[in-house]
Curated annotation (Swiss-Prot):
GO terms for biological process: molybdate ion transport. Residues 1-28 form the signal peptide. NCBIfam families: PRK04168.1, tungstate_WtpA. Belongs to the bacterial solute-binding protein 1 family. WtpA subfamily. It comes from the Archaea. It comes from Methanococcus maripaludis (strain C7 / ATCC BAA-1331). Keywords: Signal. GO terms for molecular function: molybdate ion binding; tungstate binding. Pfam families: SBP_bac_11. This is Uncharacterized solute-binding protein MmarC7_0925.
């Protein structure tokens, strides 16, 4: 017997029977009986906060087994849109991947939940770590023997944001050779300068790098271990991830770190095209987004998990990612979330 039936057959006798049988609230019944799996595809940089959200949810709903798969956000989306995999939650390090790659066929709403910025992390094993600053990092990177790392732009927002940061650095530092020296000379990336002063970075479907200078992996969290063991010297990474792993880092100017809304116009002068996916992405402030995919096996469970996330923004804050609270929502947001969001 569910709530709809109770509204139709609203007699005192039936209500009493149901009350004694523990069936007044169907969701409460589900929370204590039927075993369920809740699958999440999330960005690698969300691993720490989403581990906490997993614990919170399983504590509240012991019958639910939360299963998380961490990958680059582009790869997460493609699991759903190209590989026909299903999940109750899709959480991306770039909210725009949801409207650009999933809507309208695989999602019809999303919420923007937290922010971040790009920093450069290092260890005491990094060459010239005692000399590097926010003003000279690009010069340090050009020294013989210095090796820097970033994730693949084709798989991971942190990867294409790295390309944006380095290109934006040319204007911020007044040096038009920075991208050329760090990227063009050490990879098969290309860049177009447009007549209006904007730039388009081209990321080929197969990326080749000079492994004597560049260390690249699919997603940014795959680079943490090699950095800590000295496989390379410096890593472009989210500030939250650097904090979570107790890494030293230098902050970058607001004009290039993609973390400041006041500099959105500066960021918008650079974009990147992922040629293998025919997808063009404009540089913009870093905002994380999540949705329940339309093809989720248990859509309502996904909405329930999203509600729990929105009710606990402190989890993001404690993980070093400033929360957006209330979250900003776009599209046909489920009624259960309406009191926790503002419509964008």
């Amino acid at each position: 017997m569910n709530k709809k039936s109770l509204n139709i057959v609203a007699t005192l006798g039936i209500l009493l029977v149901l009350a004694f049988s523990g069936c007044v609230d169907q969701s409460a019944s589900d929370s204590t009986s039927e075993e369920k799996v809740l699958k999440i595809f999330h960005a690698g940089s969300l691993a720490v906060p989403f581990l906490e959200y997993e614990t919170l949810y399983e504590d509240e709903y012991p019958n639910v087994d939360v299963q998380r798969e961490s990958a680059g956000s582009v790869a997460c989306v493609r699991k759903i849109t190209e590989l026909n995999k299903t999940a109750e939650i899709l959480a991306s390090a770039d909210y725009t991947l949801i409207p650009d790659m999933m809507m309208p066929d695989y999602a019809d709403w999303y919420v923007m939940v937290s922010k971040n910025e790009i920093v450069i992390a290092y260890t005491e094993n990094s060459q010239y770590y005692d000399e590097i600053t926010s003003d000279n990092w690009y010069e340090i990177f050009q020294r013989d023997g210095v090796k820097y790392g970033f994730s693949s732009p084709n798989d991971d927002p942190c990867g294409y944001r790295t390309q944006m940061v380095v290109q934006l650095a040319e204007t911020a530092y007044g040096d038009s050779t920075i991208y050329d020296n760090l990227m063009l000379k050490n990879s098969n990336f290309m860049v177009d300068e447009n007549a209006d002063g904007t730039y388009l970075v081209r990321s080929p479907s197969t990326i080749d790098v000079n492994e004597d200078k560049v260390f690249m992996r699919s997603k940014e969290v795959d680079l943490l271990g090699p950095l800590e063991t000295g496989a390379f010297d410096y890593l472009f990474i989210y500030k939250s991830v650097a904090n979570q792993h107790n890494l030293s880092f230098i902050e970058l100017p607001d004009e290039i770190n993609l973390g400041n809304y006041a500099n959105a116009d500066d960021y918008a002068t650079t974009s990147i095209i992922l040629e293998g996916q025919n997808s063009t992405i404009l540089a913009k402030p870093i905002v994380y987004g999540m949705t329940v995919p339309s093809n989720a096996d248990d859509y309502e469970e996904g909405v329930s998990f999203t509600k729990m996330v929105l009710e606990h923004p402190e989890v993001f804050e404690n993980s070093g990612q400033p929360a957006i609270s209330p979250a900003i929502a776009i599209g046909n947001v489920p009624e259960e979330l309406s009191d926790l969001v503002v419509m964008g």
